[in-house]
Regions:
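Short amphipathic alpha-helix that is part of the acyltransferase structural core
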Residues: 1-30, 48, 126, 141-144
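Conserved active-site alpha-helix within GNAT-family acetyltransferase domains
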Residues: 86, 98-134
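Conserved acetyl-CoA pyrophosphate-binding loop and the N-cap/start of the following alpha-helix
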Residues: 79-88
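Short, flexible, glycine-rich and Lys/Arg-enriched loop motifs at helix boundaries
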Residues: 1-8, 12, 90, 94-103
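A conserved beta-strand-loop-helix scaffold within acyl/acetyltransferase catalytic domains
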Residues: 33-51, 55-74
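A charged, well-structured terminal subsegment
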Residues: 136-139
Length: 144
């Protein structure tokens, strides 16, 4: 049985860092120290295989009062096809610290269908949103 924990001490940061730095389209090249700082200052969700190995991850940046940004969501390739991304999102979406918030945001290139199942929609007023983007923060171009 796969399990999910919000305990950052349980994370296999080597596995999480490898995926984000080497395989993700959004955080390629992220330094380990940057990931460690992000984990320390976020609500994290580790997805674990029955043998305890890291199978997936999600991170939420939030003030726990009005806003949450969902990011760094992934299930490792060897564990895909088992509805685990939905299990991970169910844990995120039902977490007590994320209830009653005015707004949840995320960015995705390829998982719109998954997130729409949890109430995410296109921005209602995209003209209201701006970003200050650093296109190559880790020395390696990223896709978002």
């Amino acid at each position: 049985m796969f399990t999910i924990s919000t305990d950052p001490q349980q994370l296999d940061l080597d596995a999480v860092h490898h995926y984000l730095a080497e395989e993700s389209y959004w955080a390629r090249g992220i330094p380990r120290a940057t990931l460690e700082r992000a984990v320390a200052n976020s609500l994290v969700f580790g997805l674990y295989a029955p043998d305890g190995r890291q199978a997936g991850f999600a991170r939420v940046v939030t003030d726990k009062a009005t806003f949450a940004w969902l990011c760094d969501v992934f299930v490792l390739a060897e564990f895909r096809g088992q509805v685990l991304s939905k299990q991970l999102m169910t844990a995120v979406w039902s977490h007590p610290d994320l209830q009653g918030l005015r707004r949840h945001l995320l960015a995705t290139l390829d998982a719109h269908g998954l997130y729409r199942q949890f109430g995410f929609t296109d921005l209602a007023a995209p003209e209201r949103y701006l970003e200050a983007r650093r296109p190559n923060p880790y020395g390696v171009p990223t896709a978002n």
